[in-house]
């Protein structure tokens, strides 16, 4: 008599051979060993998969698995919806099978590659991610500084986009895995997990030399008509990486479905891919329409892991907070591991969003405050910024004379290389030293600027001011600011010193909490312990009275290219006169630099008195509160 798996059943009698587990050769049954073969379950053929099913009491599924030719490499990607499609109607049977498959995948010896990261410790990455890392396009990130010119101010800031990208890929896996384990009903499958990790790994492939200096300073000057964004370049570089290294087949072997999963990965990096959908999404990110094609609205939360366009809470920030603080020597006050413990998905309207516990709202405000502190103390450091400005000047002057070979033997300039990924792969921070050590007479001006950077002969900082919120300077006016400043000649300036527009650099900086003037917490949803399924909104006044009233400001810094003492003294008076003319805030050293000028503006004189009066009122109020507290 045969069992359900078609094999002869073993006799269950009291004979010594049966009790001892010994079966005569003619009675032996081929069994799944559960030992050595389990380590290589991805290499199983259909029959070996069926033996595994039979050994776990799931032999009735053998026919289905044989008919659909399901091999070992598919097992870890099977989900409940897949089993339904296979006409497995019994819920209990599906759950038993998924439980067995989960144990198989977890208990088999790991095929992951281990990296020892200074921030996250020993981390494991999927072999497909390692295949992506081991390509020239990804290795290029080893030669692009994470913080650009900040390395010239902070000696420890020598880290590169390479290690940051690996960290983001790892954290993306941590978050999606946490959601999968906490909420199996979300039906996050292995395809989803792998795509999210790949998106995290590849999100910065498109960065140019010195990272944000390239897209924030150089490209707007060298090629303003291109509207270059490193996210779009990351998508183009990702396509080039996959095609030039023949990774499509490796992706399919690991269970990905092309081209849908490629679309999903690219959408996580750069947002909606079609221009119409992107424009609609940028104008109204909370719109009810669904702009993505890689995943349905049912899995909308997956788009909030790598680059969260909704509120800015994503694994990219988590890694650069920890990594940048480590290398800068600045304290990091945000603990992403705590966020992982409380993250869960809740429905908000027709979409599903990643939410956190209501008690975590204060920590999220601290997270955005940490971001603001990093910008003030490091990313927008006045010396780091002027060094990047000088490097940008050198690159702009060198741009027409640098030739980088691209596809089909065509050559491109620095700014033109973004149109050809073969050329762009060769463009890294090394271009700095290529210019610095060049003997080309066409690069003389650029070379001299970089030599000044090397000798620390920098453009001199003149001062800083703030425009009022109702008089913000628009980007299309930036080019006119140096000329406007040069025309603000103070009456008491030195007659033998004349300054022109080309002598000034005016740097306009935007500081915010990541979403311009908006409070990003307004776009975060929380849940409470009483009902974890219900998403709620928490207003700022429900948290604390000490939180910021405004979430964005504009800072204007002025530098002078002339470095002699007389020119600098005159430049500072020009600057103060310009601030008076434009009704900007009084420079911090205004009373010291030009004590004869600042009293001429009434609002500047009254500022101190107003602040003193306000301080007295606050002190009196605090005193009354204490009296009331101790007399009750």
UniProtKB/Swiss-Prot annotation:
Catalysed reactions, semicolon-separated: a 2'-deoxyribonucleoside 5'-triphosphate + H2O = a 2'-deoxyribonucleoside + triphosphate + H(+); dATP + H2O = 2'-deoxyadenosine + triphosphate + H(+); dCTP + H2O = 2'-deoxycytidine + triphosphate + H(+); dGTP + H2O = 2'-deoxyguanosine + triphosphate + H(+)
SMART domains cross-referenced by the UniProt entry: HDc (SM00471), SAM (SM00454)
Assembly: Homodimer; in absence of GTP and dNTP. Homotetramer; in GTP- and dNTP-bound form. Interacts with rbbp8/CtIP.
InterPro entries xrefs: dGTPase-like, HD/PDEase_dom, HD_domain, SAM, SAM/pointed_sf
Sites where the protein binds Mn(2+): 164, 203-204, 316
This protein's record includes keyword Methyltransferase: no
Residues reported in the UniProt entry to bind dCTP: 146, 161, 207, 212, 317, 320, 324, 371, 380
Gene Ontology process terms (BP): dATP catabolic process; defense response to virus; deoxyribonucleotide catabolic process; dGTP catabolic process; DNA damage response; DNA strand resection involved in replication fork processing; double-strand break repair via homologous recombination; innate immune response
SAM domain location: 44-107
Binding site for dATP: 146, 161, 207, 212, 317, 320, 324, 371, 380
Ligand binding (GTP): 113-114, 134, 139, 142, 456, 460, 529
Essential cofactor(s): Zn(2+)
Amino-acid positions noted as binding dGTP 2 in the UniProt annotation, renumbered to this chain: 116, 153, 338, 357, 359, 363, 381-382, 529
Name this protein carries in UniProt: Deoxynucleoside triphosphate triphosphohydrolase SAMHD1
């Amino acid at each position: 008599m045969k069992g359900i798996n078609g094999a002869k059943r073993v006799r269950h009698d009291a004979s010594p051979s049966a009790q001892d587990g010994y079966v005569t050769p003619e009675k032996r049954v081929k069994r799944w060993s559960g030992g050595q073969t389990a380590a290589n379950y991805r290499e199983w053929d259909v029959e070996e998969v069926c033996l595994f099913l039979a050994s776990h009491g799931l032999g009735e599924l053998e026919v289905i698995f044989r008919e659909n030719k399901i091999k070992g490499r598919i097992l870890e990607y099977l989900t409940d919806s897949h089993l339904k499609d296979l006409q497995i109607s019994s819920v209990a049977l599906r759950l038993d099978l998924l439980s067995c498959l989960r144990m198989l995948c977890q208990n088999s010896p790991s095929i992951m590659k281990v990296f020892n990261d200074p921030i996250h410790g020993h981390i494991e990455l999927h072999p497909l991610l390692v295949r992506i890392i081991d390509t020239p396009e990804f290795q290029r990130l080893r030669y692009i500084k994470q913080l650009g010119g900040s390395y010239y101010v902070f000696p420890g800031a020598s880290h590169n986009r390479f290690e940051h990208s690996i960290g983001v890929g790892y954290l993306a896996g941590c978050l999606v895995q946490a959601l999968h384990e906490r909420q199996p009903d979300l039906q996050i499958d292995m395809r989803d997990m792998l795509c999210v990790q790949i998106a995290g790994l590849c999100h910065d492939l498109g960065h140019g030399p010195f990272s944000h200096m390239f897209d924030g300073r150089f490209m707007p000057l060298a090629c303003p008509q291109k509207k270059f964004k490193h996210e779009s370049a990351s998508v183009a570089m990702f396509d080039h990486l996959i095609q030039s290294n023949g990774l499509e087949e490796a992706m399919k072997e690991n269970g990905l479905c092309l081209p849908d999963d490629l679309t999903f990965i690219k959408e996580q990096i750069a947002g909606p891919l079609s221009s119409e959908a992107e424009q609609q999404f940028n104008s109204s990110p909370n719109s009810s329409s669904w702009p993505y094609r890689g995943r349905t609205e049912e899995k909308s939360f997956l788009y909030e892991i790598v680059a969260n366009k909704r509120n800015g809470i994503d694994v990219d920030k988590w890694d650069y907070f920890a990594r940048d603080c480590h290398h800068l020597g600045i304290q990091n006050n945000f603990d992403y591991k705590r966020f992982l413990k409380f993250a869960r998905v809740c429905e908000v309207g027709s979409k599903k969003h990643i939410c956190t516990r209501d008690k975590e709202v204060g920590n999220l405000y601290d997270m955005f405050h940490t971001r603001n502190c990093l910008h003030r103390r490091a990313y927008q450091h006045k010396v780091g910024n002027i060094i990047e400005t000088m490097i940008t000047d050198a690159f702009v002057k060198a741009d027409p004379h640098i030739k980088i070979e691209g596809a089909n033997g065509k050559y491109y300039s620095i700014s033109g290389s973004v149109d050809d990924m073969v050329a762009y792969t060769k463009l890294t921070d090394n271009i700095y030293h290529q210019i610095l050590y060049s003997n080309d007479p066409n690069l003389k001006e650029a070379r001299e600027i970089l030599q000044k950077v090397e000798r620390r002969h920098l453009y001199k900082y003149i001062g800083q001011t703030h425009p009022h919120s109702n008089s913000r300077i628009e980007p299309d006016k930036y080019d006119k600011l140096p000329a406007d400043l040069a025309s603000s000649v103070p009456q008491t300036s030195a007659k033998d010193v004349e300054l022109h527009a080309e002598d000034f650099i005016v740097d306009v900086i935007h500081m915010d909490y990541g979403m311009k003037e908006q409070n990003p917490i307004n776009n975060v949803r929380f849940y409470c312990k009483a009902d974890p399924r219900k998403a709620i909104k928490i207003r700022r006044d429900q948290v604390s009275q000490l939180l910021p009233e405004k979430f964005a400001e504009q800072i204007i810094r002025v530098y002078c290219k002339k470095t002699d003492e007389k020119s600098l003294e005159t430049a500072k008076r020009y600057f103060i006169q310009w601030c008076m003319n434009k009704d900007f805030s009084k420079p911090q050293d205004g009373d010291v630099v030009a004590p004869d000028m600042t009293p001429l503006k009434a609002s500047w004189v009254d500022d101190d008195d107003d602040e003193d009066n306000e301080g007295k009122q606050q002190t009196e109020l605090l005193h009354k509160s204490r009296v009331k507290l101790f007399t009750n």
